[in-house]
């Protein structure tokens, strides 16, 4: 069985969790080649096994180079390993309260898929199936090439091709949210895990790149207040630690970060030319319940 066919078989098993982005009608998998809704809107599976469920083309500043750097930081440097272990424990503890399985977990804004892959690996729960959704085709192509277990979708979070009350958990890691859609697609008492940066997140990089200009300040409190308007806040966890990066890892950190987009070349060189450096990971993990 090819990788593409295996991916389509998994999609077919959970096809009832998805809907047509044009008409919101149900899908069926046709000839292990495409998705077709009741009004004959058709979407073909790509050779890597993902499917593009957007209704229009979109441009993204997040390109292949950025996603490759991000993958190396996550998978090789393990910069977020403590975060992944924390999230996986929350998921397993939460799913213990559900009498039925299988379980579907959505990573909303998954990028190249490494966060979802690591979380699922740490969960070690074969009853869980992951779905990664991102507007960036470059990210989803990379995810589908590297990680065969989850379902990968190019899709617009504002018009998500996901059915009502289909997902038990939504991950939203350092990515924009759409709480209205989150509430719609979560099962009752489903879990939202949102990760947001705190003031000291990557402070060493920010202090170098913005030494002579206004610094980027992260205020997680504003995000938490908005979050509480949509979900019952179950808990907030602060995760703060430092990790030493070598020069190659520093280059990856710069390449994966939008902070470098408007920075001076001299400031970027000042950071990446160091033999090594300590970087701070400072995050809030917001845990919300979809109470109805």
Provide a role label for each language-model segment.
Residues 14-16, 239-292:
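Conserved Class I S-adenosyl-L-methionine
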Residues 104-107, 111-159:
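Class I SAM-dependent methyltransferase SAM/SAH-binding core
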Residues 190-199:
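Conserved beta-strand signature within the Rossmann-like core of class I S-adenosyl-L-methionine
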């Amino acid at each position: 069985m090819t990788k593409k066919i295996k991916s389509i078989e998994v999609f077919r098993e959970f096809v009832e969790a998805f809907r047509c982005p044009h008409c919101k009608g149900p899908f069926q998998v046709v000839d292990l080649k495409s998705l077709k809704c009741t009004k004959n809107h058709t979407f073909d599976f790509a050779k890597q096994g993902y499917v593009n469920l957007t209704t229009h083309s979109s441009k993204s500043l997040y390109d292949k180079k950025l996603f490759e750097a991000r993958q190396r930081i996550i998978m090789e440097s393990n910069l977020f390993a403590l975060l992944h272990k924390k999230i996986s424990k929350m998921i397993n503890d939460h799913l213990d309260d559900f009498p039925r399985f299988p379980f579907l977990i959505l990573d909303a804004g998954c990028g190249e898929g490494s966060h979802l892959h690591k979380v699922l690996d740490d969960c070690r729960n074969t009853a869980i199936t992951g779905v990664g959704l991102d507007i960036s085709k470059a990210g989803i192509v990379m995810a589908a090439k590297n990680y065969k277990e989850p379902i990968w979708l190019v899709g617009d979070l504002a018009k998500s091709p996901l059915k009502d009350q289909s997902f038990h958990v939504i991950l939203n890691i350092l990515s924009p949210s759409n709480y209205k859609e989150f509430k719609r697609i979560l099962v009752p008492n489903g879990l939202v895990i949102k990760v947001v940066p705190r003031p000291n997140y990557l402070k060493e990089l920010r202090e170098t790149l913005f030494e002579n200009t206004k610094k980027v300040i992260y205020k997680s409190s504003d995000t938490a207040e908005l979050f509480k308007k949509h979900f019952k806040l179950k808990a907030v966890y602060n995760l703060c630690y430092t990790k030493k990066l070598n020069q190659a890892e520093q280059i990856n950190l710069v390449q994966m970060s939008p902070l470098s987009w408007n920075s001076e070349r001299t400031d970027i060189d000042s950071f990446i030319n160091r033999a090594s450096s300590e970087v701070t990971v400072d995050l809030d993990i917001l845990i919300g319940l979809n109470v109805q």
